[in-house]
C-alpha cells in the first residue's frame, strides 16, 4: 500500500500545538478593513484553533507532519 502524502497547501496553513491541537489564522484579513470595526481587526490578528468537527479531516491531510 502506498504511503500517504502530506497535503502541502494545508501544511503551510496549520501548525500543531503542544497538546496535539491545530492552530490556524483567521480569514478576512488581507484587505477591505474599512468595513470592519477596530475590535474586529484586533481579534482577527490573533490565531484560532481548528474545531473538533474539522480535526479528523485536517489531521488526515497533515498525516506526514510531525
Curated annotation (Swiss-Prot):
<dbReference type="Pfam" id="PF01632">
    <property type="entry name" value="Ribosomal_L35p"/>
</dbReference>
<dbReference type="GO" id="GO:0022625">
    <property type="term" value="C:cytosolic large ribosomal subunit"/>
</dbReference>
<dbReference type="InterPro" id="IPR037229">
    <property type="entry name" value="Ribosomal_bL35_sf"/>
</dbReference>
<dbReference type="InterPro" id="IPR018265">
    <property type="entry name" value="Ribosomal_bL35_CS"/>
</dbReference>
<dbReference type="GO" id="GO:0003735">
    <property type="term" value="F:structural constituent of ribosome"/>
</dbReference>
<keyword id="KW-0689">Ribosomal protein</keyword>
<dbReference type="InterPro" id="IPR001706">
    <property type="entry name" value="Ribosomal_bL35"/>
</dbReference>
<comment type="similarity">
    <text>Belongs to the bacterial ribosomal protein bL35 family.</text>
</comment>
<keyword id="KW-0687">Ribonucleoprotein</keyword>
<dbReference type="InterPro" id="IPR021137">
    <property type="entry name" value="Ribosomal_bL35-like"/>
</dbReference>
<dbReference type="GO" id="GO:0006412">
    <property type="term" value="P:translation"/>
</dbReference>
<feature type="compositionally biased region" description="Basic residues">
    <location>
        <begin position="23"/>
        <end position="45"/>
    </location>
</feature>
<feature type="region of interest" description="Disordered">
    <location>
        <begin position="1"/>
        <end position="66"/>
    </location>
</feature>
<protein>
    <recommendedName>
        <fullName>Large ribosomal subunit protein bL35</fullName>
    </recommendedName>
</protein>
<feature type="compositionally biased region" description="Basic residues">
    <location>
        <begin position="1"/>
        <end position="16"/>
    </location>
</feature>
Amino acid at each position: 500500500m502506498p504511503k500517504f502524502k502530506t497535503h502541502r497547501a494545508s501544511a503551510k496553513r496549520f501548525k500543531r500545538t503542544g497538546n496535539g491541537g491545530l492552530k490556524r489564522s483567521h480569514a478576512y484579513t488581507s484587505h477591505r478593513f474599512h468595513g470592519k470595526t477596530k475590535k474586529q481587526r484586533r481579534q482577527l490578528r490573533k490565531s484560532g484553533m481548528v474545531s473538533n468537527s474539522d480535526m479528523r479531516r485536517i489531521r488526515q491531510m497533515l498525516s506526514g507532519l510531525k
